[in-house]
Amino acid sequence: MDAATLKPIFLRRVETEFAPGDVEHCAKSLKNAGRKATAEQRIELAAAMAQAAFLAPDQVGQTYDALAQGWRGFAVAASPIETLANAPVGIAPDGLWDSWWSVVEDALAGKLDALAITQRTAALGEWMPDDFVRKVAASSHLYPGISDAAQADLPPHMTLERLATCPPGSLGRQFHDLIVDNTFDLEVLDRDALGLSALPKPLDFLNTRILQAHDLWHLTAGYETTALHEIAISAFQMAQFGHNYSAQFLSITAAVSALTPARGAVVLLDTITSAWVHGRETPPMMLIDWESELDRPLDEIRADYDIAPYPRPYPADLIEKAGEITAFAARIKSLFSRFFRGGRTAPI
């Protein structure tokens, strides 16, 4: 089924409120159908993900818990994430869904590289009113540990000079080598250029810290820097503190998978749900004072904070190796290979 046929189905469904039971049923139906799942079934789940990301950010937790339960067959072993009181599903600004769908279509056509997909997804945030940003900020407090973490001052910049002093085998030395060997930017993006300090609390702290600690999370939580694991760590981050950019990004991913062979959707949902559950069942990493842990071995840090490595359902480099096998893999590789470094990211 082509994009023009699926778009009206998406538009009709995304404006109809999803209850958690609806999401669970949708995910369960997709799981049971496997590679025979229809494009209509897959776009319905993408609509649920988009609704949570853009219209009901406080419902991201219950939406993904329901998705994981429907897909995996059992509940997340963590306390439910509550929703905000008196916060109904919002109304989409005129033009939002047309812009969102154009990103999906261009991604499907292979027109977007890592920089472009980051910029286009970030630009969707420009459609959202100030009230939405305030709602995202309030929703962050629904996640364990976030209210406490956000009491801290904005963290100082890390430097390669400091990391170079860390002993061999330490987290800081691994972080240093990852940045240098791959010519990554140390803090991913320039926090000052993005104006992160002007965001409402706790988004100022959360967005500054995750840009700074993104690769520390990769190392500590056991995610590699491959295309598939960038998708996975997006779900992990979302489970940890409701990262709205990740929610928006994954909704686009789901829509792209609805327009490609169903076997790609199976890999995608296995990856998203396993990483979401991993994030939900991992203690809040936003509470870690990373600066004081840099000289310590990674295994000790994991043990002290009760952090288990990601239980990956597929080899981390699956997309890189399968790029010539499926249309979905080819599209996803161009979209997600180091997407978080591609350019200006949405500050929410």
Model segments located where?
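Core of folded catalytic or high-affinity ligand/protein-binding domains
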Residues: A47-P309
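Acidic, carboxylate-rich catalytic segments that either coordinate divalent cations
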Residues: R280-I348
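Charged, amphipathic alpha-helical stretches
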Residues: M1-R42
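Context-gated lysine
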Residues: K7, K28-K31, K36, K111, ...
